[in-house]
């Protein structure tokens, strides 16, 4: 029998061994069945885990998500460790069957948010560890099922806020770790009912102040005695940008000289140790209203916006009091914003009066009044010459609603009125309106449109026929917000008077005028093109003028360089060769001198050196002789060497003198008006100028045919 029991025991052990997942260690002999799968390189939760497991450790693996079936039917599981994995998603109701779970470790994963049903069913959970994740959002109902929590660790995340309402309900909570987040505010009264709280860590957040709470008074006992007991409380708030004013005076009065918290503001206390600052330096600045609306006049039915701004330390809260002395809060016709602006959506005649703006903080309060005048709409006179004013009804502007309600959520009437009027299209200067309301008002004469801009309190009126379904508003300013209302002017059947009724109001903003910028750019572009074209034309004209000047100069230079090549002229008196002398032949004389040769030419030879020595050439006292000029001039260039040697002989002085006399006589007879003038210059007075153009050219010599001169002289004597 004993052997049989032993065999059964071995079979049971073998069966249990087969249930244990691969790579995991199962402690089946311990009173509490434990499955240890830490650091096994698992990519998912093993599916063959014993459902009776009490402790399951899956830390330091590579599990990426948790599915609904992973922990199904594990009703005995008490401790679940999923730390240091790569979990980024948990299926809703994934832990719903773990009704006996006491501790859930999800630290050091990649969770970014906690949804509503992630922790559903964990009614007995005591320890929830979520530190070192990437949490940015926690749903407002995420902790509704974990009200029995004793420890909640949300440190080292990116949280700006947490569901404080859910925290208030965790009456068993004794440790709350919120350090190293971005929390900037803790609502007042959050810890009022957490009497079991023994430790609160809000280190390294963005808190500027801590709300006073009786819970924090127990922190002084821990600081002075150093003994942790159920009645003591450990508070850690270092690393926050504390604003050291009168709101933290209660905290300064606690004796915690062992901590090193510092102040970040105001400027006089920046960087100083919190516990070393005297209490009298924790000051607050009373509020001061710096800007507010002094007076406003609006038309009946128009929207009125009253502004009030104040400064102080701490930031003052702003409230409005109606002319009737009632506190104004969000209602059907009024909206109060956090920045101190009061917005009356549709004004009535009873809204006329003085509204009071009250700015208050712990240091005091300040008040200012704003006068609001409601302009009555024009009405026609009846037969008795009395103006009928329809009753605007009782004002509900001071009707209180739930405090702290969202201004935008109580805008039902405005939304309905905006549905009646729609801006179909809005440009920078126009807006197309469409009317969707039903014309069920009998006796409508016309519709009146009233509008004004954000920066202009002047109302603009437009009258349109009652059959109009659209209307185009012109001459609007670009980038401006407009408040527009449509009123129906009709005949009241009861009083037989003309009455008005607000049909609806709407607010719209015109577009920015980008077209104007493009127009300016096109203007600049056109001007630039005109300048460029004009410059091209001017440059072309200048180039044309320069070309003409260069061409004219070249022609003149070519005319000056055309010098007639003539033979050297030798004086028949002394036979000396005359060089560099200028010869001037008038046109009539040249024609007579070339009488026997039709192709002869006469040129003017002018030398710059001869001009420089003109004084010597023109001397009357010097003994000069004239050279005999033959009737024909020949160039020295084509003359052969033999001819040069012939002309090189020096004739006697007497025949030359006679030849000159005969030539002069002949010229006188042939031309009565012009005589041949020969300017002679001594050889010694001729110098060659260095800058003259003819200085580098070989001087042309004038050669005289002596034989022809002698024959001509004899012919003249015979005559």
Curated annotation (Swiss-Prot):
Processing and modification events after translation: Glycosylated.
Entry's transmembrane regions: 530-550
UniProt xrefs under CDD domains: IgI_SALM5_like
Subcellular location: Membrane
Topological domain ranges for the Cytoplasmic compartment: 551-719
SMART domains per record: IG, IGc2, LRR_TYP
Stored InterPro entries: FN3_sf, Ig-like_dom, Ig-like_dom_sf, Ig-like_fold, Ig_I-set, Ig_sub, Ig_sub2, Leu-rich_rpt
Biased composition (Low complexity): 393-412, 614-627
Pfam families: I-set, LRR_8
Keyword 4Fe-4S among record annotations: no
Subunit composition and interactions: Can form heteromeric complexes with LRFN1, LRFN2, LRFN3 and LFRN4. Able to form homomeric complexes across cell junctions, between adjacent cells. Does not interact with DLG1, DLG2 or DLG3. Does not interact with DLG4.
Family membership: Belongs to the LRFN family.
Protein name in UniProt: Leucine-rich repeat and fibronectin type-III domain-containing protein 5
Organism: Mus musculus (Mouse)
């Amino acid at each position: 029998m004993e052997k049989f029991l032993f065999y059964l025991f071995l079979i049971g052990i073998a069966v249990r061994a087969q249930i244990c997942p691969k790579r995991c260690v199962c402690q089946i002999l311990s009173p509490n069945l434990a499955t240890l799968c830490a650091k096994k390189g698992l990519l998912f939760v093993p599916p063959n885990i014993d459902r009776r497991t009490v402790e399951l450790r899956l830390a330091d693996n590579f599990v990426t998500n948790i599915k609904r079936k992973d922990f199904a039917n594990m009703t005995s599981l008490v401790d679940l460790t999923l730390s240091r994995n790569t979990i980024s998603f948990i299926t809703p109701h994934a832990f719903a069957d773990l009704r006996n779970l006491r501790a859930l470790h999800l630290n050091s994963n990649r969770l970014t948010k906690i949804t509503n049903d992630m922790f559903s069913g964990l009614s007995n959970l005591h320890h929830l560890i979520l530190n070192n994740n990437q949490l940015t959002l926690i749903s407002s109902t995420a902790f509704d099922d974990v009200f029995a929590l004793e420890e909640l660790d949300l440190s080292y995340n990116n949280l700006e806020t947490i569901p404080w309402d859910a925290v208030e309900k965790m009456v068993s909570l004794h440790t709350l770790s919120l350090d190293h987040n971005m929390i900037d505010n803790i609502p007042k009264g959050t810890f009022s009912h957490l009497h079991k709280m023994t430790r609160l860590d809000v280190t390294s957040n963005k808190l500027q102040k801590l709300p006073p709470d009786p819970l924090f008074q127990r922190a002084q006992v821990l600081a002075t005695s150093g003994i942790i007991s159920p009645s003591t409380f450990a508070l850690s708030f270092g690393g926050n940008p504390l604003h050291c004013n009168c709101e933290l005076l209660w905290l300064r009065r606690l004796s915690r000289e062992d901590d090193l918290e510092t102040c970040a503001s105001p400027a006089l206390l920046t960087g100083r140790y919190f516990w070393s600052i005297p209490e009298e330096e924790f000051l607050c600045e009373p509020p001061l209203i710096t800007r507010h609306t002094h007076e406003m006049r609006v038309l009946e039915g128009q929207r009125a916006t009253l502004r009030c701004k104040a400064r102080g330390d701490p930031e003052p809260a702003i409230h409005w009091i109606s002319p009737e002395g009632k506190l104004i809060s969000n209602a059907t016709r009024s909206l109060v914003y956090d920045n101190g602006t009061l917005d009356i959506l549709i004004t009535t005649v009873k809204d006329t009066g003085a509204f009071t703006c009250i700015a208050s903080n712990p240091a005091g309060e300040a008040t200012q009044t704003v006068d609001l005048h409601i302009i009555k709409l024009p009405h026609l006179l009846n037969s008795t010459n009395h103006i009928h004013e329809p009753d605007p009804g009782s004002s509900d502007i001071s009707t209180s609603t739930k405090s702290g309600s969202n201004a935008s959520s109580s805008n039902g009437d405005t939304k309905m009125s905006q549905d009646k009027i729609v801006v179909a299209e809005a440009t920078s200067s126009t807006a197309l309106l469409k009317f969707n309301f039903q014309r069920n008002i009998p006796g409508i004469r016309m519709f009146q449109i009233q509008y004004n801009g954000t920066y202009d309190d002047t109302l603009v009126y437009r009258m349109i026929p009652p059959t109009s379904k659209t209307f185009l508003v012109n001459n609007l300013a670009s980038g401006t917000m407009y408040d527009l209302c449509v009123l129906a002017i009709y005949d009241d059947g009861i009083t037989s008077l003309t009455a008005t009724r607000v049909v609806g109001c709407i607010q719209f903003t015109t577009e920015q005028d980008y077209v104007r910028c493009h127009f300016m750019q096109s203007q600049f572009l056109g001007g630039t093109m005109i300048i460029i074209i004009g410059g091209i034309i001017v440059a072309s004209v200048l180039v044309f003028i320069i070309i003409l000047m260069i061409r004219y100069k070249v022609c003149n230079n070519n005319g000056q360089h055309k010098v007639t090549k003539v033979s050297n002229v030798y004086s028949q008196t002394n036979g000396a060769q005359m060089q560099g002398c200028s010869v001037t032949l008038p046109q009539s004389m040249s024609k007579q001198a070339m009488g026997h040769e039709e192709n002869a030419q006469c040129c003017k030879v002018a030398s710059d050196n001869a001009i420089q020595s003109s004084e010597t050439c023109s001397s009357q006292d010097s003994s000069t002789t004239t050279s005999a000029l033959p009737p024909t001039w020949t160039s020295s260039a084509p003359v052969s060497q033999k001819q040069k040697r012939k002309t090189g002989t020096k004739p006697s002085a007497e025949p030359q003198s006679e030849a000159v006399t005969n030539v002069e006589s002949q010229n006188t007879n042939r031309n009565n008006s012009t005589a041949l003038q020969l300017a002679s210059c001594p050889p010694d007075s001729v110098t060659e100028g260095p800058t003259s153009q003819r200085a580098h050219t070989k001087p042309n010599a004038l050669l005289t045919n002596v034989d022809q001169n002698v024959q001509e002289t004899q012919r003249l004597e015979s005559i």
